[in-house]
């Protein structure tokens, strides 16, 4: 594979702006003594974006790998989450300074110029270390396939969830005999549940928190419920917008109703929903990464996938995945060790599940240990009804699609725009994005081979 034909300005514009360029050197290279100082025969340079609890879990998994594979030294570097990470990874891949192994959100893979900034995985080498396609959810595995080649190996899916407090729901008569929230199958049932829960909620607390002014969360929730309605985005060729404004309006009206009916307080912004939940609010919609937070707070709670208010189960999902940043001379012991390390972590993701993520490697999900994990065992079904962003270059976590469309959803949810007008604006933005060229390679979605 030849050197990618991308210049510095294209990369910076694509991945997040010129402001991060000056910080490229130090964070990407990591700190401390070289990993080969341990006396190991092979070194693997590994970049990730995991901080907080995820960071601790990843370090524990890397230490386990080091103990089991003393001949392989892992030099890991943690970079800033979001656009800075993707900028540095792109620049490294284009400048012959790429690590042997990296992590990306699956939704960003299509836009990362597979074949130019990412190298394809050797599926036979992965199989040698126990990672095979049949051990993964087909939808999830195929998200990493571009033009017939595998460019991303899924580690997990992370999903948006409906967290609920058992103490409040028990008082409201909303717990079943199994101690879980009563099932909800329609929008009317959901608002009936909120009405009953509100009557049992302590004064001064909102009934429901859902990050109403946050563009990312509102976009994620929109994706989930639009998918429940069977909504589509583009045709398979990536040449036509198929976005349904009537269905979009229905979703936007549903989101807005949480505020107009008095269940979500518009004066509470940011992470106030989680704080109120800890203090006794009955519901909050949050990502599964909040599991360790609520565990630490000693809250008696459960968590389900987002309610199927439009009849079909679908919960917004993204995925952390392992990738091979482009190296002109990829191959040899370091490349094989990168395959071995990725396979080891994917198969050993029981530890990773402690952070709330659902392991992508399905054999883990059937183990007795995983089945005992709560509330993980309550929402594991989300693996089989993932609502994902369209497979286009401008999608994915912190991507252009969320940046451009998310604020429109917020404007409807918070009341500064009417839902039907917001839906039309969303379609207009989708039309513009579809015709826009990816700065990574100068191709539109139609030219980029977006269909797996």
Descriptions of predicted regions:
Residues 147-155, 160, 186-240, 283:
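Extracytoplasmic/periplasmic solute-binding protein
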Residues 139, 304-305, 355-411, 436-452:
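Long, aromatic- and glycine/proline-rich binding clefts that accommodate carbohydrate-like moieties
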Residues 106-161, 302-304, 372, 384-385, ...:
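Hinge/lid segment of periplasmic solute-binding proteins
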Residues 10-31:
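N-terminal export signals
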Residues 191-198, 236-267:
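Glycine-centered hinge/linker elements that transmit conformational signals in sensory
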Residues 49, 61-62, 109, 219-224, ...:
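Extracytoplasmic/periplasmic substrate-binding proteins
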Residues 40-51, 72-77, 101:
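Short, well-ordered beta-strand elements
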Residues 64-136, 171-173, 275-276, 283, ...:
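Extracytoplasmic "Venus flytrap"/periplasmic binding protein-like
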């Amino acid at each position: 594979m030849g050197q990618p034909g991308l210049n510095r300005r294209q990369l910076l514009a694509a991945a997040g702006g010129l402001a991060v360029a000056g910080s490229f050197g130090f964070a990407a290279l990591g700190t401390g003594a070289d990993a080969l100082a341990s006396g190991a025969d092979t070194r693997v340079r590994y970049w990730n974006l995991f901080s907080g609890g995820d960071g601790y879990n990843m370090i524990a998994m890397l230490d386990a790998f080091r103990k089991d594979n003393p001949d392989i030294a892992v030099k890991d570097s943690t970079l800033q989450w979001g656009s800075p990470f993707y900028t540095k990874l792109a620049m490294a891949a284009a400048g012959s300074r790429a690590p042997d192994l990296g992590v990306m959100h699956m939704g960003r893979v299509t836009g990362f110029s597979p074949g130019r900034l990412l190298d394809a995985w050797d599926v036979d080498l992965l199989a040698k270390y126990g990672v095979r396609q049949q051990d993964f959810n087909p939808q999830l595995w195929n998200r990493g396939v571009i033009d017939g080649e595998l460019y991303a190996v899924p580690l997990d899916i992370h999903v948006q969830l409906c967290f609920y407090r058992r103490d409040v729901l028990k008082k409201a008569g909303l717990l079943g005999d199994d101690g879980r929230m009563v099932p909800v199958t329609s929008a009317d049932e959901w608002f009936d549940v909120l009405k009953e829960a509100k009557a049992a909620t302590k004064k001064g607390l909102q009934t429901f928190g859902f990050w109403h002014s946050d563009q990312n969360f509102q976009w994620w929730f929109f994706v989930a419920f639009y998918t429940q309605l069977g909504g589509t985005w583009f045709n398979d060729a990536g040449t036509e917008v198929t976005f349904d404004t009537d269905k979009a309006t229905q979703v936007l009206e549903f989101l807005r109703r949480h505020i107009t009916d008095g269940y979500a307080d518009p004066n509470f912004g940011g992470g106030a929903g989680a704080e109120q939940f800890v203090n006794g609010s009955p519901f909050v919609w949050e990502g599964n990464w909040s599991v360790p937070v609520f565990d630490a707070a000693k809250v008696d709670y459960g968590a389900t996938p987002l309610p199927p208010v439009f009849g079909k189960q679908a919960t917004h999902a993204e995925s952390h995945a392992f990738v091979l940043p482009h190296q002109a001379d990829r191959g040899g012991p370091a490349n094989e060790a990168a395959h071995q390390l990725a396979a080891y972590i994917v198969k050993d993701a029981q530890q990773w599940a402690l952070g709330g993520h659902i392991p992508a490697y399905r054999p883990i999900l059937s183990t007795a240990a995983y089945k005992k994990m709560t509330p993980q065992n309550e929402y594991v079904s989300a693996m089989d009804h993932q609502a994902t962003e369209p497979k286009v270059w401008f999608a994915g976590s912190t991507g252009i699609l969320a940046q451009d469309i998310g604020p429109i959803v917020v404007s409807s949810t918070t009341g500064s725009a009417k839902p039907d007008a917001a839906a039309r604006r969303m379609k207009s933005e989708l039309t513009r994005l579809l015709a826009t060229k990816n700065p990574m390679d100068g191709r539109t979605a139609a030219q980029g081979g977006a269909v797996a």
